[in-house]
From Swiss-Prot:
SUPFAM superfamilies: Class II aaRS and biotin synthetases (SSF55681), Putative anticodon-binding domain of alanyl-tRNA synthetase (AlaRS) (SSF101353), ThrRS/AlaRS common domain (SSF55186), Translation proteins (SSF50447). Its main location: cytoplasm. The lineage of its organism: Archaea, Methanobacteriati, Thermoplasmatota, Thermoplasmata, Thermoplasmatales. The keyword Lyase does not apply. Binds 1 zinc ion per subunit. Its EC number is 6.1.1.7. CDD domains: AlaRS_core. Keywords: Aminoacyl-tRNA synthetase, ATP-binding, Cytoplasm, Ligase, Metal-binding, Nucleotide-binding, Protein biosynthesis, RNA-binding, tRNA-binding, Zinc. PROSITE patterns: AA_TRNA_LIGASE_II_ALA. InterPro entries: aa-tRNA-synth_II/BPL/LPL (IPR045864), Ala-tRNA-lgiase_IIc (IPR002318), Ala-tRNA-ligase_IIc_anticod-bd (IPR018162), Ala-tRNA-synth_IIc_core (IPR018165), Ala-tRNA-synth_IIc_N (IPR018164), Ala-tRNA_lgiase_arc (IPR022429), Ala-tRNA_ligase (IPR050058), Thr/Ala-tRNA-synth_IIc_edit (IPR018163). HAMAP family: Ala_tRNA_synth_A. Catalyzes the attachment of alanine to tRNA(Ala) in a two-step reaction: alanine is first activated by ATP to form Ala-AMP and then transferred to the acceptor end of tRNA(Ala). Also edits incorrectly charged Ser-tRNA(Ala) and Gly-tRNA(Ala) via its editing domain. This is Alanine--tRNA ligase.
Length: 876
């Protein structure tokens, strides 16, 4: 986008005494009513002059500022919306909500779904982790903040307002609403992009502080687009969207003029932490100057800050070091608020995706607690944050949070202990510790870079910690998205979906609209295409007296493509026949998946979310988020509850609801199985158990499932459990197989079936004892053989050599390591000979090389060579 397009030369500016100028520092265009102003108002072009000199007559709290914003825009016809969760379950391309517009991308911004109001006003809690290292450092950075917005979604048939009204509203809110002198406000022109959209924008500044951004979104991402912004191409879209973002915390800070933003938004919590830590007080005079100076250099430059402050304060370094303790107070409180929002959305800490971000915040919080000697608890800080925000935050799952934090703190403590050993090991083998070492120690062992630096300093080594270390680590875990191109292009034919009209339809007649090779598209079909974890239907088409098998079915746009084992020409009518046994089993397993998920959530807790799923004919699996092992008693409880519901015979209903009507009734749980980009959501509901947006085929009543049996539960990654189960006929087959096995054991053991399990347990126990006894006897025998064996002389040392079976090598290895001796073993392997060397000191490969003059396989403590002929003369 060109720097100057003239698209922001608005009548409002001209009619209200604004002049368009070019900033003498950065060269950007900006608008102001102050004829003497030469700079755009942004830092570092301008300083922070509001600290100690707030331009707002009244000092607002967060809740007061939020209410003032809502009142102003509700009076002007804006519908007030409730905030969305910070974890965007309605989209799959981002981990956290970074801005209010995320709530409406891509379904509303693309024009597919009507907005929930037009225009709207809201305050959206948001979390941004890219500046996590600067929290507490600059006095202005936050991971958690609320973005106030007034948005309008303009289409051809529904135009609300655009640039003129948007700027007027912002100006009137700041001047009439908050009482700010209009001459202090500047509007800086700057293009904006994010979430697949872009447009012209105005950044709004007051006394150096950016308080809002007004985006006029009218472009969408397009690889062939004519406009380029920051390396990405865009093209015009049909919608014109007003996307504004006002920083609630920044407006509150502006009204109070405190040294830092934290003191404006967390005053009572800061006092509480001060009372319960060894930080005595906050040096407000010095801190004010730290903040003022820090904004004058991007990125943050500590050396510049110290140098500048040194000109004013003779003891700048001493005061700066004391101020670092105050940083930890701000970090602790900020992170507690972000964690509160994450836990409200039932995020479980882990090593992947949003769970990783939660874990990072927890570990930084633990570190901050230790640095200031905080006597309170993180859960207490989370609750205090909630008490200040309970008007906009749903009740917290306190027991869940306590459980999760307890587990995380235990893990961190264990990792720290192991990590110390890892650091010492690295320091023994390396002369320096690089960034990759720091990332490994942090990611895998939870060791903060400053701990590594302290340990390295004791060894006389200096560790360079990147100032953006945590942001750099986070970038390795962020979800990446890219425009996907279909590998194959099909004609835009809309296939009518008969499987939705009647999921029990087994036969149909359709017209072949497209045929190429072994692929056909019909005008209508009862064959279900693969999707939502449900495999495609199989069956056949009847054509000219022949059966042509349907091997696969896929959906491409509105067309449903059938892959065949033969060819059918275009323009003919064919009869389609569904493989009903396969379809019915898939319907049972698909419906059973919904039932299982609902019961798991009911018994394990609301933190259970679907993480993955695969339905199949013989068995299915469901992956869920959960942070504790699921024991046998809980499995039985789950199965019994499912059986009760099946016996009750709960009906299964399917409804196509408008997007926001569906969300209003069922919440964002709807999107556990995926997010449809369509104006309506197909909601599959098991009465009183589960409701989910789903495109699959289902039973009319869960009684048709018959029975469900969990086969196994396994942790497939941290805090993700896979539940493999069978339902219907496959469950019956499992019971039959299990009974047959028990019957066979009963016959072999001459015991009743109800005693067969005890018999097997006792037999296994006895066999294990016999094996241990044999192993002990064999160990003693081999020890005696080693003692009596001939030795082979290699250089200055003699090494015992014995003949042994390959199955005895593990025993020999245990003996060698326990006694600290080296041993050579000769074993017969078919017609060949294997020579194994065992060396606790790590010289096994060298021993074999000296002995046989060839390279060995294995490791330095146990290696071997296989040769064609007997090479040694070993006598027992």
């Amino acid at each position: 986008m060109e720097k100057q397009t003239g698209e922001l030369d608005l009548k409002f500016f001209k009619n209200n005494g604004f002049e368009k100028k070019i900033c003498r520092v950065c060269g950007s265009y900006f608008w102001t009513t102050d004829s003497r102003r030469e700079t755009c108002g942004d830092t570092p072009c301008d300083e922070y002059t509001f600290i100690g000199n707030p331009p707002v007559p009244k000092k607002y709290t967060l809740s007061e500022m939020r209410k003032a914003f809502f009142d102003f825009f509700e009076k002007r016809g804006h519908k007030l919306l409730e905030p969305y969760p910070v974890v965007p379950r309605w989209r799959e391309d981002v981990l956290l909500v970074n801005a209010s517009i995320y709530d409406f991308q891509p379904h509303v911004t693309s024009g597919i779904v009507k907005p929930p109001g037009n225009p709207i006003v809201m305050s959206q809690p948001s979390i941004r982790m890219n500046d996590v290292d600067l929290v507490g450092v600059t006095g202005r950075h936050l991971t958690s903040f609320e973005m106030l917005c007034h948005d309008a979604f303009n289409s051809k048939n529904d135009f609300v307002y655009w640039k003129e009204e948007t700027v007027r509203y912002s100006y009137e809110f700041l001047t009439d609403g908050l009482g700010i002198d209009g001459s202090l406000i500047t509007y800086k022109e700057k293009p904006w992009s994010g979430g697949g959209n872009a447009g012209n924008a105005l950044e709004v500044f007051v006394r150096g502080l950016e308080v809002a951004t007004l985006v006029f979104m009218d472009m969408k991402e397009d690889q062939e687009g004519e406009v380029e912004i920051e390396g990405t191409r865009y093209t015009k879209m049909d919608m014109q969207i007003v996307d504004t973002g006002y920083g609630l915390e920044r407006l509150t800070w502006l009204s109070q003029g405190t040294p830092t933003v934290y003191q404006a938004i967390y005053p009572e919590i800061i006092d509480y932490v001060l009372e319960n830590s060894y930080v005595e007080s906050i040096d407000n005079e010095f801190l004010s100057d730290v903040v003022r100076v820090s904004v004058m250099r991007e990125p943050y430059d500590e050396a510049f800050v110290l140098s500048t402050l040194g000109e004013k304060y003779p003891n700048a370094l001493e005061r700066f070091e004391k101020a670092k303790k105050v940083r930890d107070i701000f970090v602790l409180i900020d992170h507690a608020r972000s964690l509160m929002h994450m836990f409200e959305a039932f995020v479980i800490p882990s090593n992947v995706k949003v769970g990783y971000l939660a874990r990072l915040l927890i570990r930084r919080s633990i570190r901050a607690q230790k640095n200031i000697g905080f006597k309170g608890s993180l859960i207490n800080l989370i609750e205090r944050n909630y008490n200040e925000l309970k008007d906009i935050v749903k009740p917290l799952p306190i027991e869940f949070i306590k459980d999760v934090l307890s587990i995380e703190m235990q893990k961190y403590s264990e990792l720290e202990k192991r990590g110390q050993q890892v650091i010492e090991k690295i320091l023994k083998t390396k002369k320096s510790i690089d960034i990759d070492d720091l990332v490994l120690l942090y990611d895998s062992h939870g060791i903060s870079p400053d701990v590594v630096a302290a340990m390295a300093a004791e060894k006389g080594l200096k560790v360079m910690i990147p100032p953006n270390f945590h942001a750099m680590v986070i970038s390795r875990h962020e979800k990446k998205s890219a425009l996907k191109k279909s590998a194959k292009v099909y004609p835009n034919i809309e296939t009518r979906t008969l499987y939705y009209d009647d999921s029990t339809m087994r036969e149909f007649t359709g017209l072949v609209m497209y045929s190429k090779g072994n692929e056909v598209i019909l005008d209508k079909t009862a064959f279900y295409p693969e999707g939502g974890g449900q495999p495609a239907d199989h069956g056949y088409f009847e054509f000219k007296g022949k059966k042509i098998n349907v091997l696969d079915v896929q959906k491409h746009g509105n067309a449903i493509v059938h892959k065949l084992d033969g060819e059918i020409p275009e323009g003919v009518r064919v009869k389609g026949v569904i493989d009903w046994e396969r379809r019915s089993r898939l319907m049972v397993h698909h419906t059973a998946t919904h039932l299982l998920l609902g019961v798991l959530r009911d018994i394990l807790g609301d933190h259970v979310w679907q993480s993955g799923v695969q339905k199949d004919v013989s068995e299915s699996h469901l992956d869920i988020t959960h942070y504790k092992r699921i024991d046998e008693d809980t499995i039985k409880k789950i199965e019994h509850r499912i059986f009760e519901l099946i016996t009750e015979g709960r009906p299964v209903s399917v409804k196509n609801l408008d997007w926001y009507m569906a969300i209003g009734k069922y919440g964002f749980r709807l999107f556990e199985g995926g997010v449809p980009l369509s104006p309506k959501v197909r909601v599959v509901e098991i009465e009183g158990v589960d409701a989910e947006g789903c495109g699959g085929t289902h039973l009319k009543n869960i009684s048709s499932i018959g029975v469900l049996k969990i086969k196994k539960i396994e942790a497939i990654q941290e805090n993700i459990y896979r539940i493999t189960f069978v339902a219907g006929v496959p469950a019956l087959e499992l019971f039959e197989d299990s009974y047959d096995l028990a019957y066979r054991v009963s016959n072999i053991s001459k015991k009743n079936i109800d005693q067969a399990g005890d018999f097997v347990e006792n037999t296994v126990r006895e066999l294990s004892k016999i094996k241990r006894d044999l192993d002990s006897a064999r160990t003693k025998l081999i020890e005696e053989e080693i003692r009596k064996s001939n030795s082979i002389k290699l250089g200055e040392k003699e090494i015992p050599a014995i003949e042994a079976e390959t199955s005895d090598i593990d025993i020999v290895s245990r003996i060698a390591h326990s006694k600290g001796i080296e041993v050579i073993i000769e074993s017969r392997v078919g017609t060949k000979f294997r020579y194994t060397a065992i060396s606790p000191s790590g010289k096994s490969k060298q021993i074999l090389h000296d002995l046989l003059h060839t390279d060995a396989e294995g490791n330095d403590k146990l290696s071997y060579v296989i040769v064609d002929h007997k090479e040694l003369s070993i006598t027992r």
